[in-house]
């Protein structure tokens, strides 16, 4: 699966501009972490262990936007922690889009549907004829409850608060490390995979761009990842991010102390990474 044309052209334009001005080093992606707090404790994630002393720290909105301006990368990946917990995530996304950035929201999917309900509540009031069929479809597919419908039709609780709306420059980048059984084991909570799938389905009905974000570990079955991508293709997912699961000191210590697991059997080495990713190029051609 190739990058969408709009993204390819935007990034290519940035590369060409930097080359023409003689820049030897420049950023193409800014990884922005507005907070380190998360609502899951995924096995293998070093972030919430590495940043255990800064869980309550929250980066001011102005600093986030200034960081993007100073870096001047065409793409910003908002991660964390769980970025949808960030109190000003809507303002941050809209601020980055106003800077003409490509925005990826790297999320575990648990709060996605709530954010999309907020979007519906704002836009339904202004154009109920357009959005009522979408509400009916979402309800028919059990992606909205009767209570959700009632709240959306009432309109937003705070009309002045921004929302995250569909645009070709913004992607929900949903964390999925395998099919249902595997993913729920890794995130250490049952039902997370199904909630992610519900969120993806809702996002595609509403016209959002969606990508998946997958980490491959030593015990990951490559066939399962291929089946995952085939399944996501049936949902209309627009792209995939796939990366090797290297170890973090904090994650290794947590794995031993809290779970009693051997980190050497979980994280990838260089050789194992080459073996696991040998088929990745064929996936990209689908």
Regions found by a protein language model. Give the residues of each.
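Radical SAM enzyme [4Fe-4S]-AdoMet core and its adjacent flexible, acidic
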Residues: 59, 131-141, 148-166, 173-177, ...
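Conserved alpha-helical substructure of the radical SAM core
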Residues: 2-119, 123-169
């Amino acid at each position: 699966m190739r990058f969408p044309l709009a993204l390819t052209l935007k990034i290519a334009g940035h590369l060409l501009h930097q080359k023409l001005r003689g820049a030897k080093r420049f950023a193409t992606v800014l990884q922005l972490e507005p907070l380190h707090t998360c609502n899951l404790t995924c096995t293998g994630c070093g972030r919430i262990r590495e940043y255990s002393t800064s869980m309550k720290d929250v980066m001011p909105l102005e600093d986030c936007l200034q960081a993007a301006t100073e870096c001047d990368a065409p793409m910003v990946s908002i991660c964390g922690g769980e970025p949808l917990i960030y109190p000003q995530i809507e303002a941050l996304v809209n601020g980055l889009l106003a800077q003409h950035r490509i925005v990826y929201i790297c999320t575990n999917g648990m709060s996605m549907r709530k954010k999309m309900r907020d979007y519906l509540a704002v836009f339904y009031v202004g154009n109920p004829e357009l959005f009522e069929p979408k509400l009916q479809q979402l309800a028919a597919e059990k992606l909205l409850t009767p209570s959700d419908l009632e709240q959306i039709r009432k309109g937003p609780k705070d009309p002045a608060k921004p929302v995250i709306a569909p645009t070709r420059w913004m992607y929900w980048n949903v964390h999925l490390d395998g099919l249902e059984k595997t993913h729920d084991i890794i995130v250490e909570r049952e039902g997370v995979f199904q909630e992610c799938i519900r969120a993806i389905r809702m996002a595609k009905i509403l016209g959002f761009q969606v990508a998946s974000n997958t980490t491959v570990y030593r015990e990951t079955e490559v066939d399962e990842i291929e089946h995952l991508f085939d399944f996501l293709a049936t949902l209309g997912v627009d792209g995939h991010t796939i990366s090797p699961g290297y170890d973090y000191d904090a994650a290794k210590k947590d794995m031993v102390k809290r779970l009693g697991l051997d980190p050497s059997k979980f994280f990838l080495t260089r050789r194992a990474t080459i073996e696991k990713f040998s088929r990745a190029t064929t996936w990209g051609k689908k």
